[in-house]
């Protein structure tokens, strides 16, 4: 990771601005997928409240309900959520039961295969796929593909001719970390870093992108 900063002065500046900073990982791809659904088209504080209520009312030991339990709670009418979130969480639960949403499984296959598998889950799109692969499997070298604000930050820092694919070559094998550092820097300028730290919630992109 220090070698990435040695190759790229912009990443070196991001490292210096956030010493010791690392991507905030979820316990599992299943939990990351649940968060992706809960935060879809929803402000982060509201999504965080939905997650807390889901854990408090239906989880055990401070954890989200197990996939089979989550599916049963939804289909029995014990758990109601806005919009299509219940439908999407059922699909996430089914995928977890089928073994798709496990860290070892997603890390064992090529990235393209993992993306294809995740995109078969109803309610999981490209943005959520990035989230699950980076924060759910804690992969260090997955480059986000649906982060428009990352693209804007790259343009801001590297110039109008720079692209995500070209500048990220110098970030290997820590493209995930570098991308999250740049996004965190942007969030800091926009004032959300302080809010997330104060609330104890993970720093995640605004889902209204």
Regions found by a protein language model. Give the residues of each.
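HhH-family (HhH-GPD) DNA N-glycosylase catalytic core used in base-excision repair
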Residues: 1-209
């Amino acid at each position: 990771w220090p070698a990435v900063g040695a190759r790229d002065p912009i990443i070196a500046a991001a490292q210096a601005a956030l010493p010791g900073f690392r991507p905030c990982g979820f316990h599992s791809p299943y939990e990351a997928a649940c968060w992706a659904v809960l935060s879809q088209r929803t402000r982060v504080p509201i999504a965080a409240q939905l997650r807390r209520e889901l854990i408090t009312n239906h989880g055990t030991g401070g954890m989200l309900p197990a996939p089979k339990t989550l599916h049963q709670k939804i289909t029995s009418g014990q758990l109601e959520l806005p919009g299509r979130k219940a439908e999407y969480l059922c699909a996430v639960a089914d995928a977890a039961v089928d073994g798709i949403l496990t860290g070892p499984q997603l890390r064992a296959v090529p990235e393209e295969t993992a993306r294809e598998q995740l995109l078969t889950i109803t309610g999981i799109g490209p943005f959520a796929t990035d989230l699950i692969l980076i924060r759910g499997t804690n992969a260090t070298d997955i480059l986000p593909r649906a982060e428009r604000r990352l693209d804007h930050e790259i343009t801001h820092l590297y110039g109008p001719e720079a692209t995500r694919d070209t500048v990220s070559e110098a970030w290997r094998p820590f493209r995930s970390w570098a991308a999250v550092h740049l996004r965190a820097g942007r969030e800091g300028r926009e004032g959300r870093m302080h809010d997330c730290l104060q609330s104890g919630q993970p720093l995640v992109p605004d889902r209204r992108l």
